[in-house]
């Protein structure tokens, strides 16, 4: 049985009065093909809300990052249906339902702390 490693890195955006915010994440996760996994993105300043405009990016080796999810849960036309974004337990979440081998990548979360995107 093959395993698909998923790597999660988090970014913060837009310095301002909250420029000391610390973003927390799982350093890496592994899921088997067909499995489900949820990556989360938390903030030391409190609960992540839709006002943080959470973005999720996917980066495959040798490629530039591409946006999967924007403004918490909106998808681009190229985002596979198996990916979804939400808020879960005070964090931004990216859920992958039915992982495929081509989903092996690094996943980045971006949060805005200035109220601007």
Swiss-Prot record:
Pfam families: V-set. Residues 54-70 are annotated as: Framework-2. Residues 74-109 are annotated as: Framework-3. Residues 1-19 form the signal peptide. It is found in: Secreted; Cell membrane. Transmembrane segments: none annotated. Disulfide bonds join 41-109. Residues 71-73 are annotated as: Complementarity-determining-2. V region of the variable domain of immunoglobulin light chains that participates in the antigen recognition. Immunoglobulins, also known as antibodies, are membrane-bound or secreted glycoproteins produced by B lymphocytes. In the recognition phase of humoral immunity, the membrane-bound immunoglobulins serve as receptors which, upon binding of a specific antigen, trigger the clonal expansion and differentiation of B lymphocytes into immunoglobulins-secreting plasma cells. PANTHER family: IMMUNOGLOBULIN LIGHT CHAIN. Immunoglobulins are composed of two identical heavy chains and two identical light chains; disulfide-linked. This is Immunoglobulin lambda variable 7-46. It comes from Homo sapiens. The gene is IGLV7-46.
């Amino acid at each position: 049985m093959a395993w698909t490693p998923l790597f999660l890195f988090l970014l913060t955006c837009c310095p301002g009065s909250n420029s000391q915010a610390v973003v927390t994440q799982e350093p890496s996760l592994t899921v088997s093909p067909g499995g489900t996994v949820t990556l989360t993105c938390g903030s030391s300043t409190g609960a992540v809300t839709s006002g943080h405009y959470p973005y999720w990016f996917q980066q495959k080796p040798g490629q530039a990052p591409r946006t999967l999810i924007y403004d918490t849960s909106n998808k681009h036309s190229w985002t596979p249906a198996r990916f979804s974004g939400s808020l879960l337990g005070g964090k931004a979440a990216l859920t992958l339902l039915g992982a495929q081998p081509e989903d092996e990548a690094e996943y980045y979360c971006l949060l805005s702390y200035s109220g601007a995107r």
